[in-house]
Design a protein with these regions (language model features):
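Bilobed "Venus flytrap"/periplasmic-binding protein-like clamshell domains
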Residues: 1-21, 82-148, 223-233, 239-242
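Hydrophobic residues within well-ordered alpha-helices
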Residues: 44, 103, 152-153
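A ligand-binding cleft/hinge motif common to bilobed small-molecule-binding domains
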Residues: 50, 54-64, 128, 153, ...
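Periplasmic-binding protein-like
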Residues: 71-73, 79, 83-86, 175-211, ...
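Short glycine/proline-rich, acidic loop/turn segments that cap or connect secondary-structure elements
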Residues: 210-226
């Protein structure tokens, strides 16, 4: 999910280590390379998906019957705490507003209508302020967090919500963009984007995947790669990701704010 071009080599190193761990545990066949030719949704729907990462909200809404959650990575990017992350609410650096409340009747841009970080968490932050009424002058969809930030920086939108791991990567990789932006507030927290596999993956392969993941996250030779990706550790305990995602949606409905507008 954070596979920026500059980070693909790092992701490939992690996958190579994970693939070796699976082969050592007699899992076959194991792809030699990561698949980058499919969209996120095509990947999540693929019956042969062995290992991937997913946004929690679309999993909860559309893909729960197709995917098994393997584990939750923990990140050390600003805005992350243990298994949880937040979205940064971002505006232009020269925007005079000091609080989210002051963005009322402004132009909002969201990456995707079913994004947890871009919509669901943002809606949770807005719901008590909106209290059932329209909050923004307009809401448009950009297709990606990166595109949303471009629109805000260019003055074509006033505010967006971007997950904190994406923002941390862009602050490293594209300071010429992020220097034109600032964080005005943070959303409520949600579990980090989980690692997933197809529901068709066997129990023995699930066990092997979790064991191989534990090895990848404890391998000292991979420490620089994990650091580059802000990966701190991995939580292999029973998952509560989708429950929290649904709680935030229910809370927004309680505030009579079911749709971000």
């Amino acid at each position: 999910m954070y596979d920026f071009p500059a980070l693909r080599e790092a992701h490939d190193r992690l996958w190579s280590a994970l693939a070796r761990g699976l082969e050592d545990r007699s899992v076959t066949p194991v792809p030699r390379q990561l698949t980058r030719s499919l969209s996120h949704r095509q990947t999540w729907m693929h019956p042969g998906l062995l290992f991937g990462q997913a946004c929690e909200y679309p999993v909860a809404k559309s893909f729960e019957e197709r995917l098994t959650i393997l584990a939750t990575p923990r990140y050390d990017a600003p805005g992350c705490t243990e298994d949880f992350y937040r979205s940064a609410i971002v505006t232009r650096a020269d925007e005079p507003a000091k609080a989210l409340e002051e963005m009322r009747n402004r132009r909002c841009v969201v990456n995707e209508p079913d994004s947890n970080s871009g919509m669901n968490l943002f809606r949770a932050a807005l719901a008590p302020l909106a209290a059932g009424a329209r909050f923004f002058q307009s809401v448009r969809f950009s297709g990606s967090h990166r595109a949303s930030l471009d629109l805000v920086a260019a003055g074509e939108a006033d505010v967006t919500a971007v997950d904190c791991v994406t923002l941390a990567h862009l602050q490293r990789l594209e300071p010429q963009l992020t220097s034109r932006l600032r964080v005005i507030d943070w959303t409520p927290a949600s579990p980090c984007l989980p690692y997933v596999t197809s529901r068709r993956t066997s129990e023995s392969a699930l066990t092997a995947l979790r064991a191989a993941l534990a090895d990848v996250f404890s391998d000292p030779e991979l420490a620089p790669t994990r650091e580059l990706l802000f990966l701190e550790s991995v939580d292999l305990s029973p998952d509560t990701t989708l429950g929290r995602v649904r709680e935030l949606e229910v809370e927004a409905h309680h505030w009579r704010y079911p749709v971000l507008l």
